Amino acid sequence: MKALLKIEWIKTWRSWPVFIMGIGMPVGFFLLFSSIVSTPNPEAQKDFLLSYMLTMTGFSMSSFGLFTFPYMLQEDQTEHWLTYIEHSKVSIAAYYLSKIFRVLLNFMVAIIVTFCVGAFFRDVEMPFFRWVGSGALLLLSGLLFLAFGLLIAQIKSQQFMSLVANIIYLVLPIVSGSWVPISMFPKWVQSISEWTPVYHVNELVVNFAKDGKFSWKSLLFILAYTVVATGLALFIKSQRESDRG
């Protein structure tokens, strides 16, 4: 396991441009739009900056779950690294845990960097326990992005996989209210938004950060989406392996 983690650490440094882009682009959007949008009510402005910082943190994390995770899994398949692992003394569970640990590390860096930018450059304020709690809830919500990434990794064609990942990455945050409040959408779009997984990630984290309230409904939605996506990915993988055998 230690050797696998070392390999993942080396691979992370080799792909540093992707790592920087995954964090830098959402942070750039946060700084840009937070400087443009201004409300006459100071409290409303504070709420906007807080919620926008949190949604952009989730947006940053989604890039690692939807792109980095499935691409590293597919790369290991095409380069036969996974085949080597399966025929070695290393357990397949240790292999997947090392991959998950790498993405979780990316998640944590994205959370820390975006939170620091919000605090030092936009004067976002929260009690300490809410900073920690919001980060923990975002990290927990990262399981959703990992599950979707695992499902995307089952797509054989790299071009189609990239297309699907980009659609989910760009469309879901827009529909879910990460960019603009869903109250600005038509009613029929709002009804769709409230069923999307990213909407419930935003609800879970933002409600806790603002009021210290825990949304069990949103947590259940996130867990349900995570279980369904993971189950579907494992089913497709097992079917493919049985057909091959």
Question: PLM ranges: what are they?
Answer:
Residues M1-M25, H80, S242-R244:
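Aromatic- and glycine-rich beta-strand/loop motifs that create alpha-glucan
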Residues K2-L4, V180-L219:
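Short hydrophobic, aromatic-rich alpha-helical segments embedded in or entering the lipid bilayer
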Residues L32-F33, S51-Y71:
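Long, hydrophobic alpha-helical segments
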Residues L32-V37, I155-W195:
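Transmembrane helix segments
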Residues F33-S34, E203-G245:
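Alpha-helical transmembrane segments of multi-pass membrane transporters/translocases
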Residues L66-S88:
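Transmembrane helix boundary and interhelical loop/hinge segments in multi-pass membrane proteins
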Residues I92, I100-L163, S215-L219, L223, ...:
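Alpha-helical transmembrane segments and their short interhelical loops
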